[in-house]
């Protein structure tokens, strides 16, 4: 009798981790291909976005335009996640390096759990201090 609740909790945890990994994978794939439309599909309605030295809270439509300009000026070649963790508020975060034709950028994004899924609440694309 006691095994059923434990199994249900375990299954819910596994499903939550898979949803989180799926969103992370979609973000990485959109960054690799330079697809702002696919990227903003993973965002909360108003995202905290930093691209190079410009930072503000933008709607998805505004963020898509900003990211389109960035990808046009810096065509992506590859992206690799180097670190992942959890903030003190329970948000998952990922840090990676985006390699473009013009150089390297450090990418950080935070995932927030919203109802039954995860969404990107913050994305930072900053000049990388050390090219790989």
Model feature map: region roles:
Residues 65-104:
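Surface-exposed, charged secondary-structure patches
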Residues 20-35:
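Short, aromatic-enriched amphipathic alpha-helices that serve as compact interaction elements
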Residues 104-132:
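Short beta-strand edge/turn micro-motifs at domain boundaries
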